[in-house]
C-alpha cells in the first residue's frame, strides 16, 4: 500500500530543530530510515491550489482551482484570479459596490470546479482501491473504488447540533459511510479544556473564553478550537477506517492544523527574532507551535501502527514558514519550501532528497502503482529515491493524457451551507474578506 500523508504548513526548519531535540520520535525514525528533504513549491502559496496541483500533477490554469472562493455574477462563475486582474485595472471600488448591493456573490470552491482527473480517479479507473480523507475539494464525494471522506464532513452533524437544514449532499462515498463515522466528528464547541492546555498555558477561565470567543483573523484564541476539531476528526476517522477497510492500494489523508497554528502562534515562539512581543503572551502561547508538532508526531505514530511495515510512506507539505522583513511569519512572499519524506516499502534508505517539487508527487504515485504517467503532467517520477529492485522490474510507461474530468451530476447549491463554510474558512484564517 501507498500511504500519502499531507500536512499543511509543515516547515523544514522547525521539523529539523525539534527532531534534533528528540521531540518527534516518529518523524525522526522515518527521516533516518528513508529519504528526506525539502519540497519546492510555487507562488502563490495557496493551500487549495497547491494540494490540487499535488494530486493532478498540473498547474492551476489547467486544473481550475486558483483560490478558496469564486464569484458569481448573473449566473456566471468568475475565478478569483480573473477578478484580481480586473481590480488591478481600477475596478476595485466597482466590484466592492456590486458585492454590497448583492449583484455579485461569493461561494466556496468545491471538487466540481476541478477540470482534470486526480490520481484518486485515475487509480480507481484502473481498478485500484483508494481511500481519501479530508483532501482539499474532495467534496462532493464521487464514486470510486474504495471510499472518500470529503473535506466538508465536519458539517455532517449540522442538523443534530444546530437544527439547521440537512447536511450537504455526498459528504462521503459510499453515502452509508457518513452514518458509520458520524460519532467520530468533533465539533469546535466539543474540544475540551484539557486539549487547550496541551498547547497553551492558560487558566480554566481563559480556556472557557477560548471556547466561545468570536472570530478574529489569525488569533489563536479564536482559531484553536477550529483547527483542533478538524484534525481530531481526521485522526479518529483515519484510525477507524484503517481498521475496517483492507486491501487499499492508496490511502491519502490531509491535516490542516500546523498551518493554522503557525500563522497564529509563531509570533510568540522561540523562532521569533522580534523581542517586542510581551512576556505574558510568550508565556501563554509560546509552546503552541512546538506542542502541535508533537501532537502530529503522536498522530503519525498511531497511524503507523495500523499499517503494514512494508507500506511505502509519503509525507509532504505544501510550504514552510519564514519570518519575513516585516517581522511576520508567512509564506506568501518568499515561497519557502515544504517537507518531503519517502520511507519504507519501495523507497531507498538514508538518502537526502534534492530537486523535488510539488508536481513530482502525482507521477511518482502513479509509477509506484504500476500505472502510466501522463505526458501532460508537469512533474517527474522521483526514481532516484525508489529502490533499484523495484525500478529494474517496473519500466516506466506513459500516456499522452488522462484527459478532462467527466461531468458529474451537479449538487444542488445551498446558500446557507455556502455561508457557513465561508465562515469556517474565515475562522481558520484561509480567507480574510470576501475580496
What does each of the following model-derived ranges do?
Residues 15-69, 131:
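Short, structured active-site-proximal loop/turn typified by the sulfatase FGly-forming signature C/S-X-P-X-R
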Residues 310, 315-345:
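Histidine-centered active-site microenvironments of extracellular/periplasmic hydrolases
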Residues 322-323, 353, 358-360, 370-402:
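Polar, surface-exposed loop/tail segments
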Residues 14, 105-113, 224, 286-290, ...:
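Active-site rim elements
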Residues 36-55, 133-142, 254-257, 319-323, ...:
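Short, solvent-exposed turn/loop segments enriched in Gly/Ser/Thr/Pro and often Arg
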Residues 383-435:
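Long, internal low-complexity/basic segments
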Residues 28-29, 120-124, 301, 344, ...:
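Non-catalytic, well-ordered alpha-helical segments in soluble enzyme domains
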Residues 58-279:
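His/Asp/Glu-rich, glycine-adjacent segments
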